[in-house]
Amino acid sequence: MGEKVRILGIAPYKGLVTLMKRYAGQRDDIQLTAMLGNVETGLSLAKEHYRNYDIIISRANTASRIAKGVPIPVIDIGIDYYDVLLCLKTAENTKTKFAVLGFRSLTTIAKSICNVLKIPTDIFSINTTSEASSLLDKLKEQGYKTVICDTVPYNYAKLIGITPILLTSSMESLKAAVDQAVYTWQTHLSLIHI
């Protein structure tokens, strides 16, 4: 076996840092360092540390910001249909008025699931982090008690009294991203040696 792929994992929430560390221990082909950083903090960490790594994995908006700011490949952990379905079922079980709020990577999947399973759910897409607060204020005024969201609106929802359900990535989503990172790096190396 060749050298280990050096992966920097930048997670937008603590649970994903823990998941990354646990999963890294199961693989002998990677050296994964996990750090906590959401959007701008994640970008700062990436800029500070990328020179010591071959590739970066992160999630959603944080991954997108990092990809625009560093010269090494960035793999988005992504959001799995199963991840969203678990959150929808959790929200349904609260028996409260709930909505899905997030960037299109979340809301597109949520719309698909809700259409197929005929789950009546209000779904709101945001394009920038600044939109989240004003939209949450409107949801509060309209009587929403629960919101499925990513890390960007999570804390503000708690602050104004809406119960947030954080969309978390499953081990399967993380495994797929790490596999993609290893494949991307191996492809890069094979092209260098042609």
Region spans (language model):
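N-terminal basic/disordered segments at the start of proteins
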Residues: G2-Y23
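Structural motif
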Residues: G9-G15, M35-V39, S58-N61, G78-D80, ...
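A short, well-structured beta->alpha microelement
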Residues: D29-E48, I79-C87, I119-K138
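A broadly used, surface-exposed interaction patch
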Residues: I30-Q31, R65-R104, N115-I123
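Helix-enriched interaction subdomains in cytosolic or periplasmic regions
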Residues: A46-G78
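A short, gly/pro- and small-residue-rich
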Residues: I66-V84, N155-A176
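Short, charged, surface-exposed secondary-structure boundary motifs
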Residues: D83-E92, A110, E131-L136, S173-V182
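Conserved small/polar residues in nucleotide/adenosyl-binding loops
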Residues: I192-I194
